[in-house]
Curated annotation (Swiss-Prot):
Modified positions (N6-(pyridoxal phosphate)lysine) in chain numbering: K270
Chief place where the protein resides: cytoplasm
Keyword Glycoprotein: no
Gene Ontology CC entries for this record: cytoplasm
Origin species: Acinetobacter baumannii (strain ATCC 17978 / DSM 105126 / CIP 53.77 / LMG 1025 / NCDC KC755 / 5377)
MF annotations from Gene Ontology: glutamate-1-semialdehyde 2,1-aminomutase activity; pyridoxal phosphate binding; transaminase activity
Names of required cofactors: pyridoxal 5'-phosphate
Any Pfam family the entry gives: Aminotran_3
Name of the protein in question: Glutamate-1-semialdehyde 2,1-aminomutase
């Protein structure tokens, strides 16, 4: 399926020198079929493709465009920063300012280090947990994505609860390396306790998405995050909350503020730079002081704390800290999801939505709750593919995978919400 011959030709040209025609796999539309849409520009809640077609966007560059695309204050901040120089490889006051803001908003973060991406942040947090504890094993959860570092491209293997070993999910990850990562079912407190009872004194840390955004959107059950906090305290393991997707997105203080849990380390993504390439990790002072140059855990980056991202982030936080910013954002999303649910019910299509702040999930299922990767796999993926293409045809851009969360921004108007609901009504009618 292709929107136009021009899109087909552009994808063919891209595939000549770019593997698969894309620079990140999900963009290839393998999860939904068809040809990727090539985007020319974006503004507010909208994208325009190379054919000039406009879309109401619910991807938001995978989360960080919380103010909408090309917000004038962000553009001005970036332009001003660029005029002063793109990169110095030296400290700037803007790094300090943004670090101060992050630590003030998230009390669990006493020290913070900037990186170039969320993957770098989670990769280094794992290294730091190992360096701090002197242990090797890491616990992660099915359906959670923490970037593409070797330690985390791992699934539960047959030797998980006998030998405490994981198996790679990607070629190129050595089995001897992956065996140090244990993968457990999300929201399974019993499995967590069993794992720690067997291997707790070998476990350096636990990393988790507090709201999983890569098996669509799955929220933690009551007590799950606190159970992780408790076993980490008992076995002196490092509790890492990966807020690359949820940080400043589900609430100003991140998911950790919503669920009232305090991690030892937190990882953050490109939202702290208003969508520019940046990440960060931070947490307890005694752990963070193990990072070079204070300690023996190495981390570095020429563009870490780059001035464009720092100044864009500082400007963005001025908006996020305004009274009622998040309550208005959440209310707008509630309106959208209620309309989508009503449209599906009217069409007689099994459909469910979930919301966490300004993140949302859409599921074609009659299950009561979606609480794990297995329950997500039980959803009707083929129905999602039809829905995706029906909405795209009508000018609504959703993530091209049934396993990705959606996002709303402060730029989405009442008219955009109504437009989206009407597109859904027409698409559901077409799917009957």
């Amino acid at each position: 399926m292709s929107l136009s011959p021009k899109q087909e030709q552009l994808f063919k040209q891209a595939s000549k020198h770019i593997p698969g025609g894309v620079n990140s796999p999900v963009r290839a539309f393998n999860g939904v079929g068809g040809t990727p849409v090539f985007i020319e520009k974006a503004k507010g809640a909208y994208l325009w493709d190379v054919d000039g077609k406009r879309y109401v966007d619910y991807v938001g560059s995978w989360g960080p465009m919380i103010l909408g695309h090309a917000h004038p204050d962000i553009i001005k901040a970036v332009q001003t920063a660029a005029e002063d120089g793109l990169s110095f490889g030296a400290p700037t006051v803007h790094e300090t300012t943004l670090a101060d803001i992050i630590c003030e908003i998230m009390p669990s973060i006493e020290l913070v280090r900037m990186t170039n991406s969320g993957t770098e942040a989670t990769m280094t947090a794992i290294r730091l947990a190992r360096g701090y504890t002197g242990r090797d094993k890491i616990v992660k959860f099915e359906g959670c994505y923490h970037g593409h570092s070797d330690s985390l491209l791992v699934k539960a293997g047959s030797g998980l609860l006998t030998k405490g070993e994981g198996e790679p999910t990607s070629k190129g990850v050595p089995a001897d390396f992956a065996k140090h990562t244990l993968t457990l079912p999300y929201n399974d407190i019993a499995a967590l306790k069993e794992c720690f009872a067997k291997f707790g004194h070998e476990i350096a840390g636990v990393i988790i998405e507090p709201v999983a955004g890569n098996m669509n959107m799955v929220k933690p059950i009551d007590g799950f995050l606190q159970a992780i906090r408790d076993v980490c305290d008992e076995y002196k393991s490092v509790f890492i909350i990966d807020e690359v997707m949820t940080g400043f997105r589900v609430a100003l203080g991140g998911a950790q503020s919503v669920y009232n849990v305090k991690p030892d380390l937190t990882t953050l993504g490109k939202i702290i730079g208003a969508g520019l390439p940046v990440g960060a990790f931070g947490g307890k002072r005694e752990i963070m002081e193990c990072i070079a140059p204070l300690g023996g855990v190495y981390q570095a980056g020429t563009l870490s704390g780059n001035p464009l991202a720092m100044r864009a982030g500082i400007e963005m936080f001025k908006h996020l800290r305004q009274p009622d910013f998040y309550s208005k954002l959440s209310a707008q999303l509630e309106k959208l999801l209620a309309g989508l649910q009503a449209a599906a019910d009217e069409a007689g299509i099994p459909f469910k939505t979930q919301q966490a702040g300004a993140m949302f999930g859409l599921y074609f299922t009659d299950q009561e709750d979606i609480t794990s990767f297995d329950s997500m796999l039980a959803c009707d993926i083929e129905a999602f593919k039809k829905f995706f293409h029906g909405m795209l045809k009508r000018g609504v851009n959703l993530a091209p995978s049934a396993f990705e969360a959606g996002f709303i921004s402060s730029a989405h108007s009442d008219e955009d919400i109504e437009f989206t609901i009407q597109a859904a009504k027409e698409t559901f009618a077409e799917m009957k």
